[in-house]
């Protein structure tokens, strides 16, 4: 085979029928490339008398001064469907990067299958921040691959047993416990929980566990009929509340796993002719800006996005600097407003 001029990795990729990042990984012996493909790439490289650009390789060993934020969200979705909580997180992370002299590369990752290749092969960033309500159970293999490749990364979310990597997240259990205790102190006893309670939604699951623990502390048992799945959108909260009301189960409060779910639930209650909080008290979780401006203003659990952004950036930079780093849980704060004042 003949190539005009000096052969490049793009030439090898074309002849081997693979991507340029795959060629780069094969040439450096990455285990991500299977043996057959690697041998084909190496054979073509030899035939083309391809030489690795050592100057470019040495540049890749230097810090780029850039961090990558991989956001778990479908880029084809309407912007209005993105939880405003993550807007606050993005702002906090951006400010923290600026304080540390780092640029920030933001990428939607809902449709991605290779987190590392999305940034590393083009030398875009020194490490990754994973952000979103990610199903890290399904992503465990990809997280483990990042560890094995020596990729520096931190993730926002609940610290799960056996989960690879460093996590920074709010104390979701305590938040669920505190807000349910508040409802109980208002005299509520039939408290519904709207939000997924499975391990595929670890943040919601921890909030639900805190909710159940608070009920037990007051001598009450959780009732499966009072838990209804919902994701973090107003529409999902509205639908979940409608389904709950259709069951005919008597309730005097709704503990929602997020503010958006709570706001959707309040709409469903109004449509059903029920008053908030006189008939049904409602609480949320996140303390997004809208929580204070809806009517009635929403009682919620505030997550400290400023501290969260700072910790995510600082821990990632520490990892890049080869320093030991541990996961951390951030305290939350109960914010009482009109929607829960049931008494």
What are the residue ranges of the model-derived segments?
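N-terminal helix-turn-helix DNA-binding module of bacterial transcription factors
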Residues: 1-65
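Alpha-helical recognition/docking segments in bacterial nutrient-uptake
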Residues: 1-4, 62, 66-181, 246, ...
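Short gly/ser/thr-rich secondary-structure transition/capping motifs
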Residues: 47-53, 109-113, 266
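Short hydrophobic segments within beta-strands
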Residues: 70, 130-131, 194, 255, ...
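Hinge/beta->alpha junction and helix N-cap segments in small-molecule ligand-binding domains
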Residues: 75-88, 106-115, 134, 168-178, ...
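Short acidic capping loops at alpha-helix termini that bridge into adjacent secondary structure
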Residues: 190, 222-225, 276-281
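Flexible loop/turn connectors
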Residues: 238-343
